[in-house]
Amino acid sequence: MKSMIAVLLLALVATSMAGYLGLGYGGLYGAYGGLYGAGVPVGRAVAYSSSIRHPGFGGLGVLGGYGGYGYGLGLGAYGYGGYGLGYGLGLGLGHGKIW
């Protein structure tokens, strides 16, 4: 579980940094959509395979996503990719529930 959280945080930082490095509006909105779309089924698969059934995990993913989003903005960029990944994984892990 700890390694999964570490990988998620690394992904959030990486996608936020991608915004900082100047991938542009279109690419970041695309990353948001793609990561959000991939995050939901991946989160659900992890939740079911590891017997994580508590909706609260959705909140963790959403908060992680906001962290990536805020980090991107703080650097003068747009971390929509990190937001999408955290939100999608959060919804998946929470079985569609945010809290």
UniProtKB/Swiss-Prot annotation:
Entry keywords, A to Z: Secreted, Signal
Organ and tissue specificity: Expressed by the venom gland.
A GO-annotated cellular component: extracellular region
Annotated signal peptide: 1-18
Localization of this protein: Secreted
Keyword Signal: yes
Family designation: Belongs to the non-disulfide-bridged peptide (NDBP) superfamily.
Protein's UniProt name: Glycine-rich protein
